[in-house]
């Protein structure tokens, strides 16, 4: 499985698909994560670290770890700690 199979233009939106519809559980946006707040919080310096900051569900932790391990963060659009106004957290 590679990221190109799962990439869609919606992934580049600031507010992405809510609840990760259309992706297997734990991939993309994990279970109900952040109501579609951009990217699902990859750990390891991409997005919100481990999905905790701004993430209402603990699923951000598992999803972030899985996503960072399986998906190429560049293709997925992960930018290391680049703030997008007007939100105080990172996508």
Curated annotation (Swiss-Prot):
Keywords in alphabetical order: Cell membrane, Membrane, Transmembrane, Transmembrane helix
Domain of life assignment: Bacteria
Transmembrane segments: 50-70
GO CC terms in record: plasma membrane
Membrane topology: Single-pass membrane protein
Predominant location category: membrane
Compartments in which it is found: Cell membrane
Protein name: Uncharacterized protein YmaG
Source species of the chain: Bacillus subtilis (strain 168)
Gene symbol of the encoding locus: ymaG
């Amino acid at each position: 499985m590679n990221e190109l199979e799962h990439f869609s233009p919606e992934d580049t939106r600031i507010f992405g698909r809510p609840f990760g519809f259309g992706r297997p559980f734990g991939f993309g946006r994990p279970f109900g994560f952040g109501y579609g707040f951009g990217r699902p919080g990859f750990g390891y310096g991409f997005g919100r670290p481990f999905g905790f900051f701004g993430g209402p569900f603990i699923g951000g932790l598992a999803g972030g770890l899985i996503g960072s391990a399986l998906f190429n963060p560049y293709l997925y659009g992960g930018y290391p700690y680049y703030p997008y106004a007007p939100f105080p957290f990172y996508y």
